[in-house]
């Protein structure tokens, strides 16, 4: 059974509840906009939300509880005080220290964010009062929304195209914004400028989960019933008709079925029952209902995925894509997938539903707040890396240039053929090493623990010598890759000499080509003047064969 992070699960368009199991398998690298971030920045990310008309905006939090934004900044949706786009992450100073419990976004876009303290902040597009601050001015910075919410703790938020919902800890729903089709649930079609509690049939109900389509709203109550209101032109309310609904109405066709979660696409709806079954209704022009055809459905219709129990459903109000995950870990997708209409659930190779939206949805936006918080449990590789040069657990010390490097005999024997033989019958706990320098030998031992090397291109030449001496083929390849990154006209001949000396043929060819391409400058360097006679002779001969000396 999956354990949830604080708050309800709510697939509300882009609502934000993530499970601890999903924390282990989310990969922001699948979202193109993160290519603008450095490796160092990516390593600090704790949560992330990709939004915008083309997946061209992102908000993310770091392990230091700082919030950063990046992208085109339409309508000031980045909240940085202006409408300038940015390819460099900018920090939201006004929210520093705030922990996000739930986050959603609209089409403008506008942002609604709930903190773990139960506060609500909004910013961005506001032409329809979807920010809930009583105005229609775009919000360039986060604004604390407290009207009618001052004594409430908000635990979940959801955004439609231009309207907003929040769910409080006592099971109440508040709504505001665009209301042309009754999506605010007030009984009229007048826009709602500030938060207003949604009552009617929800008056004495305890709501557990909320969601928004483009212009409709959904709520699941603690008894498993589903209540719907707003636009219904495609049957997305599941009431058997196409008339709009200005106040909450129970989906009677689900009588006797206990629903746990609801998710809304652009104009279609998915629900997940307590028995792990999916029902869908609404627009189906892309096959997003998964029923095997493209006919709209105004009543809940079963979606057959596989015999395994479904534990997660996914949809977002800006897309016509649907996804689900089974208890066995299988992920399925259907609907609009990169221009194709997939009319039945298709088994993917993904391990989480988030990847479906990163790779196949249009636009490629997140359907919930991604969480990339690292798991406390270390992998085997991480544990080994941590133990490198650790005197508390080591049973062997190498003395190099007067400095100790701490290691573990069993690991060295497993990882290196040389140590397997040299340490086989040895009872020594100190080994003096004079053949190689301290930086080079330490880098070698670290490689045995991590599979990576951390040396400058110049120092990597020494490690290449060691790799050749110990017949470490993979290490030799890594050294060559590192050395290539540091080549220049001044050191090209020296690196070529090293490549020849250590029989690094790939590096030798690379250095030779570099020298030929920069021949005039290279032949004027001190390295060329001091070049070994035999090497010089071979270089000139080979250069002549490739036409380097032609007029």
Curated annotation (Swiss-Prot):
UniProt xrefs under SMART domains: BTB
Tissue: Expressed in testis and heart (at protein level).
Transmembrane portions of the chain: none
Record GO cellular component, one term: acrosomal vesicle
Subcellular location per the Swiss-Prot or TrEMBL entry: Cytoplasmic vesicle, Secretory vesicle, Acrosome
InterPro entries documented for this protein: BTB/POZ_dom, RCC1/BLIP-II, Reg_chr_condens, Signaling_Regulatory_Domain, SKP1/BTB/POZ_sf
GO annotation, biological process: cell population proliferation; digestive tract development; liver development; lymph node development; spleen development
Residue stretches making up the BTB domain: 394-457
Superkingdom per UniProt: Eukaryota
Segments annotated as RCC1 repeats: 64-115, 117-169, 171-222, 223-274, 276-326, 328-382
Alphabetized UniProt keyword annotations: Cytoplasmic vesicle, Repeat
Domain notes: The BTB domain might play a role in targeting to acrosomal vesicles.
Name of this protein: RCC1 and BTB domain-containing protein 2
Species whose genome carries this gene: Mus musculus
């Amino acid at each position: 059974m999956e354990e949830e992070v604080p708050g309800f699960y709510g697939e509300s368009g882009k609502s934000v509840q993530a499970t601890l199991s999903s924390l282990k398998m989310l990969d922001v690298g699948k979202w193109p906009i993160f290519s603008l971030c450095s490796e160092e920045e990516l390593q600090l990310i704790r949560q992330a939300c990709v939004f915008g008309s083309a997946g061209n905006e992102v908000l993310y939090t770091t392990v230091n509880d700082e919030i950063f934004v990046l992208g085109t900044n339409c309508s000031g949706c980045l909240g940085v005080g202006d409408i300038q786009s940015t390819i460099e992450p900018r920090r939201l100073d006004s929210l520093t220290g705030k922990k996000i419990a739930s986050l959603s976004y609209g089409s403008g876009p506008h942002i609604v964010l709930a903190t773990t303290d139960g506060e609500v902040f909004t910013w961005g597009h506001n032409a329809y009062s979807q920010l809930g601050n009583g105005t229609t001015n775009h919000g360039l910075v986060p604004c604390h929304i407290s009207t009618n919410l001052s004594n409430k703790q908000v635990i979940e938020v959801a955004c439609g195209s231009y309207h907003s919902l929040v769910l409080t800890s006592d099971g109440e729903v508040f709504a505001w914004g665009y209301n042309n089709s009754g999506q605010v649930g007030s009984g009229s079609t007048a826009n709602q400028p500030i938060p207003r509690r949604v009552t009617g049939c929800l008056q004495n109900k305890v709501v557990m989960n909320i969601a928004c389509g483009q212009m409709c709203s959904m709520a699941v109550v603690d008894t498993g019933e589903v209540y719907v209101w707003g636009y219904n032109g495609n049957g997305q309310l599941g009431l058997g008709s196409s008339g709009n609904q200005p106040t909450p109405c129970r989906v009677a066709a689900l009588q006797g079925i206990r629903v746990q979660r609801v998710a809304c696409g652009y104009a279609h709806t998915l629900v997940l029952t307590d028995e792990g079954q999916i029902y869908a209704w609404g627009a189906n022009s892309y096959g997003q209902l998964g029923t095997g055809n493209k006919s709209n459905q105004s009543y809940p219709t079963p979606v057959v995925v596989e015999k395994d129990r479904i534990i997660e459903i996914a949809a977002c109000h800006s897309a016509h894509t649907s996804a689900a995950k089974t208890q066995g870990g299988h992920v399925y997708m259907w609907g609009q997938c990169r221009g194709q209409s997939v009319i039945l659930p298709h088994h993917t190779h993904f391990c989480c539903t988030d990847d479906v939206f990163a790779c196949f949805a249009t636009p490629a936006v997140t359907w919930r707040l991604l969480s990339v918080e690292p798991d406390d449990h270390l992998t085997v590789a991480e544990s080994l890396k941590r133990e490198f040069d650790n005197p508390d657990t080591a049973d062997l010390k190498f003395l190099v240039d007067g400095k100790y490097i701490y290691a573990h005999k069993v690991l060295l024997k497993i990882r290196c053929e040389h140590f397997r033989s040299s340490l086989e019958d040895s009872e020594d706990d100190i080994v003096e090493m004079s053949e190689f320098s301290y930086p080079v030998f330490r880098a070698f031992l670290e490689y045995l623990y991590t599979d990576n090397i951390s040396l400058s291109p110049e120092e990597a030449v020494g490690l290449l010598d060691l790799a050749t001496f110990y017949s470490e083929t993979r290490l030799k390849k890594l050294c060559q890759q590192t050395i290539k990154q540091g080549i220049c006209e001044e050191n090209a001949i020296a690196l070529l000499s090293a490549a020849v000396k250590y029989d690094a043929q790939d590096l030798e060819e690379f250095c030779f080509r570099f020298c030929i391409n920069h021949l005039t400058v290279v032949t004027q360097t001190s390295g060329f003047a001091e070049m070994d006679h035999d090497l010089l002779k071979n270089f000139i001969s080979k250069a002549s064969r490739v036409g380097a000396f032609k007029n």
